[in-house]
Regions:
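Extracytoplasmic metal-acquisition and chelation regions
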Residues: 9-299
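C-terminal motif of bacterial Sec signal peptides marking the signal peptidase cleavage site
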Residues: 4-8
Length: 299
């Protein structure tokens, strides 16, 4: 019951009794805007030829936290039937953009609300395989509500994505869980935490250090010393860092890890390359983590 309530409040449905069949009535594709390209990739693959998807954040150099929407972004949202925002305080500019461009037949999916993460929680929801599965379910359900005439098509798209598109992603997660569960790791910021939790890896780096780097503030001296000592004394087996947010403190830890012979794996905030699919991007990173763990635990 709780999951149903969360799903219901996460998507703001369109008002008006006839809006659910609006897309099929015009025999037009559903116009979708995703705040970030990782959600946009999933939305595009679930919708196939029945949707058009525009991702606002699609450059590796853009910072979703403080992005300034353009006139083109506003125009895209103005005509969108469906908007996907991360929520949880990650992209507050989306709500402002939607409010400034009202449309009675538009639905908005707030991923944070869907999975129960409020502002102040860890907003890196796309790094949680569990949350990703919930998003897939919700987007597919929303497509069928917006365009019920194509429900069978959307069901098939979802099945293909889950059984084929995500097959390697799911397998790598299972492999890492079964082989390296409980392994202590170091990390540069909280973007790593949701994935590590699902992989059953133990993040040893102080949580306050991870949060500081993610939020763009300076870690405390005590946290810096702790993170450094964990590497020097090899309390962590590998170190994972976000290469799109490499501060001097993070760079120092990466160098320290390499000097100590601790394998280093890399993740990024958004799709790299920008044209990659969600699953190809994640698979590449998971393979890097798996290789680092293998190297660290091989005598």
């Amino acid at each position: 019951m709780l999951a149903c309530l969360m799903a219901a409040c996460a998507t703001t449905p369109p008002s008006g009794s006839g809006s659910a069949t609006n897309g099929s009535a015009r025999n037009a594709k559903i116009a979708v805007v995703a705040a970030e390209n990782f959600w946009g990739s999933i939305a595009a693959q679930l919708g196939g030829e029945r949707v058009t998807v525009r991702s606002i954040i699609r450059s590796p150099d853009a910072d979703p936290h403080d992005y300034e929407p353009t006139a083109a972004d506003a125009r895209a949202v103005a005509v969108a039937q469906y908007v996907v925002e991360n929520g949880a305080g990650y992209d507050p500019w989306v709500a402002k953009l939607v409010a400034a461009n009202p449309a009675p037949a538009r639905s908005v999916l707030n991923v944070g609300k869907l999975v129960g993460v409020k502002e102040g929680g860890n907003p890196h929801l796309w790094y949680s395989p569990h949350d990703v599965r919930q998003v897939i379910e919700q987007i597919s359900a929303d497509y069928k509500r917006i365009d019920p005439a194509d429900s069978t098509y959307f069901d098939q798209q979802k099945q293909n994505y889950e059984t084929q598109g995500l097959a390697r992603y799911v397998q790598l997660i299972a492999d890492i869980k079964s082989t390296y569960s409980g392994t202590p790791i170091g990390a540069s910021e909280s973007i790593v935490t949701p994935l590590a939790e699902d992989l059953l890896l133990k993040v040893a780096t102080p949580e306050s250090f991870l949060d500081a780097i993610s939020e763009g503030t300076d870690p405390t001296t005590a946290d810096k010393i702790t993170a450094d000592e964990q590497i020097k004394t090899k309390q962590v087996k590998i170190f994972i860092f976000n290469s799109q947010n490499s501060t001097p403190d993070v760079a120092a830890l990466v160098t320290e890890a390499k000097n100590a012979g601790i394998p280093v794996a890399t993740v990024t905030e958004t799709l790299v390359p920008a044209t990659a699919s969600f699953q190809d991007w994640q698979v590449g990173q998971l393979e890097g983590i798996k290789q680092a763990l293998s190297k660290a635990t091989t005598p």
